Amino acid sequence: MGKYFGTDGVRGVANQELTPELAFKIGRFGGYVLTKDTDRPKVIIGRDTRISGHMLEGALVAGLLSTGAEVMRLGVISTPGVAYLTKALDAQAGVMISASHNPVQDNGIKFFGSDGFKLTDEQEAEIEALLDKEVDELPRPTGTNLGQVSDYFEGGQKYLQYIKQTVEEDFSGLHIALDCAHGATSSLAPYLFADLEADISTMGTSPNGMNINDGVGSTHPEVLAELVKEKGADIGLAFDGDGDRLIAVDEKGNIVDGDQIMFICAKYMKETGQLKHNTVVSTVMSNLGFYKALEANDITSDKTAVGDRYVMEEMKRGGYNLGGEQSGHIILLDYITTGDGMLSALQLVNIMKMTKKPLSELAGEMTKFPQLLVNVRVTDKKLALENEKIKEIIRVVEEEMNGDGRILVRPSGTEPLIRVMAEAPTQEVCDAYVHRIVEVVKAEVGAE
């Protein structure tokens, strides 16, 4: 991670850390780095439903236009929609304005290259070097060489038509409950599943600029679980604010997380000859039960650091086509170049149709180890990892576990948090281990 770019672009509190002035510079310098070898380059921009999206979009557009780029605004659209359209529309770059699952006061800016993939570390470093320069020495075109802006609000429908053709049958006869987090999928997901002839019930589909992710979406699936039980739905699908995550709910109201969704997809893809190199790429946060279920089905796993960008890098390196995170980022590289909540949802429902099995049965083939994750707000993430007392309590707990479970302590890539996670044979033991470490982290580097 750099000074400005975290694991998922540039993020911060809108109008304080992520200011219009910074957004202008990011547009100008980012646009230059990604389009400098192209005459009259095209850059597309999408955003989620946050109140700050318009402000940041205006500044970004101005920065891009100042380099001579032609800018196409997509309006409210999901992050994977921007990734797909960047390549489909032959744009030199795509930009998404979103802070994903974060609260409304945050916002972020992430770029996609002409191939639809997120930027490399080298590209981000080049942009950061320009941001840190005291003097802006980039060319300043004038007159007819300046860029122009246009709107392409049909982009969302073009993207939906693309992902819709990845399933084999319609979804008639199924009742699907949707939670769109008052975010980027609020209009898109209900249209998509209704178009596939499913009966739908919805929540989180009334964005007002301030309610994105507020007690709804993939970080609050328990709310959708109540709707599933109330309506007698066959499945619930919860997306996050920018639509790159999926958490599901089975017909009994049980939450089905990213690990379980990956396992279901991996098993089906292996059975149908689609799983490349018989391998799934996941992160160190995936549940031990996920790996045991893969082993039982003779499927290989490959672990990376936390962050969908690292999963993607490993997938590209090894030629794999399925990967993801427990948090619900599922990457289906045969179809798209980033995590995609709606595409993952289509595949999950399609597997239910093809196997004629309810989601509870599909998910039940994986037994999860009890797990607890606690986020501790800290004054300094780097100091926390170097603190001797914190390192000592982690060592003591790992010795007590004696291989029967695991501890993972790591910094958040996007927020001032230390994440403390444990897995153990029982929830009671798991909770005790986590809280012992959390107490030390709070005492040593905890923020008020």
Swiss-Prot record:
* Catalytic center residues: 100
Positions contributing to Mg(2+) binding: 100, 240, 242, 244
Identify the cofactor(s).
Mg(2+)
A GO term from the CC aspect: cytosol
Sorted keywords for this record are:
Isomerase, Magnesium, Metal-binding, Phosphoprotein
A Pfam entry, by short name: PGM_PMM_III
State the post-translational modifications: Activated by phosphorylation.
Q: What is its EC number?
A: 5.4.2.10
The protein's annotated catalytic reaction(s) are: alpha-D-glucosamine 1-phosphate = D-glucosamine 6-phosphate
Give the co-factor note.
Binds 1 Mg(2+) ion per subunit.
Give a GO biological-process term. peptidoglycan biosynthetic process
The reply to whether Magnesium figures as a keyword in the UniProt entry is: yes
**Could you tell me which residues carry Phosphoserine?**
100
Domain of life (superkingdom): Bacteria
Q: Which Gene3D superfamilies match?
A: Alpha-D-Glucose-1,6-Bisphosphate, subunit A, domain 3, Alpha-D-phosphohexomutase, C-terminal domain
GO molecular function list? magnesium ion binding; phosphoglucosamine mutase activity; phosphomannomutase activity
Its family remark reads:
Belongs to the phosphohexose mutase family.
PANTHER family annotated for this entry?
A: PHOSPHOGLUCOMUTASE (ALPHA-D-GLUCOSE-1,6-BISPHOSPHATE-DEPENDENT), PHOSPHOHEXOSE MUTASE
**Which NCBIfam families does the entry link to?**
glmM, PRK10887.1
The role this protein plays is:
Catalyzes the conversion of glucosamine-6-phosphate to glucosamine-1-phosphate.
For this entry, the protein name equals Phosphoglucosamine mutase
Upper lineage is: Bacteria, Bacillati, Bacillota, Bacilli, Bacillales
Q: What gene is this protein translated from?
A: glmM
